[in-house]
Amino acid sequence: MNINAAPQILGRSSQDITPGYMSGFGNSFETEALPGALPVGRNSPQRCAYGLYAEQLSGSPFTAPRGANERSWLYRIRPSVKHSGRFAKTDMGLWRSAPCFEHDLPIAQLRWDPPPMPQEKLTFLQGVRTMTTAGDVNTQAGMATHLYLITQSMVDQHFYNADGEMMFVPQQGSLRLVTEFGIITIEPAEIAVIPRGIKFRVELVDGPARGYLCENYGGAFTLPERGPIGANCLANSRDFLTPVAAYEDKDTPTELYVKWGGSLYVTKLPHSPIDVVAWHGNYAPYKYDLRTYSPVGAIGFDHPDPSIFTVLTSPSETPGTANIDFVIFPERWMVADNTFRPPWYHMNIMSEFMGLIYGVYDAKPQGFVPGGASLHNMMLPHGPDREAFDHASNGELKPVKLTGTMAFMFETRYPQRVTEYAASSGLLQDDYADCWNGLEKRFDPNRP
């Protein structure tokens, strides 16, 4: 499919800055694909320009505090009630939602090889493989982690997720996310977040694609507090990009899929739902380049907690306890003196799902490869393998720059339950726990 031939009409921001995208996190944006499509000084005029319909999309209750209130006004060719015919329940494939109890694996530290790219034709919806679920989709708490394998673009198919917002983390191949708010293109080392309720389709850009997907049932991702770090570093607001308006006036049959309550439903439409000509508000999809993250670390001694690398957080009702933290381990300098520099041995109240986009992870130089994954559930010990321990314990402590690496972690307060696919797909490494077998007793009471 030639994606460049699709009949989208691109818009612009009112400031005409950064063609294709508007800069900022959580801003109140405004953008129009036709001049004058946005009403001035009001949200729902008696008659909208160009014969459009005004529609509000709310991502929070009306009475949420102003700082947490999320909504956008859309000016579209048809209202969304015309996008919802008679829905029929349809097969979910390998997509699962919490709570999900499918296997009888004993508790353990787990690690998976990357899945091979399939030969059959798989769209995004067909290519989702759920690895873990946590919490409960019906109480809007918790998350699910998925892999995606895509070998063909969605054509005359669209989707929205009522259960949660979705974070795409490409590992191989680029994606073009055609949303009703505009068009987002992402490549490995970039992420995109599509809030719940926003319609989109997934297209391939440069061949088959593989990556990770976090489905957030809880509070929307937001930037973490910096505390004494101050006003700069970590993920800076200006580096987040939201698309300008783009629309299709396309009267061809299409299917609309909706994930709702852990099930998948489908309806048929006689037209494309990507028909928003203009919009304004702060509830919108966005992208972020992980390579713009400015890491902060120890410049004297000791290894800081991994929370120092948080990009985005989904807060829970308990202050300081995340529904999800999205954490990365990017290129950085290691300079701490008289210090064991890799991540230390650890038991944690949080449950950690890790993936590797490219390069080598410093605590696991073997076995944890790009496209693979690991799971260290709550209160299960983990840490460097024998090779990493020996190297870090005996190596010269000169400044070292970790280059060509990008690992990440989805960390949640809830136990992550492994799906049947994750347990029996053949990707699970049976010998993962053996990586610690070489750690010998080193204690000698006669040698301090």
Curated annotation (Swiss-Prot):
Homogentisate binds at Y361, H382. Fe cation binds at H346, E352, H382. Pfam families: HgmA_C, HgmA_N. It is an enzyme of class 1 (oxidoreductase). Pathway: Amino-acid degradation; L-phenylalanine degradation; acetoacetate and fumarate from L-phenylalanine: step 4/6. Belongs to the homogentisate dioxygenase family. This is Homogentisate 1,2-dioxygenase. The lineage of its organism: Bacteria, Pseudomonadati, Pseudomonadota, Alphaproteobacteria, Hyphomicrobiales.
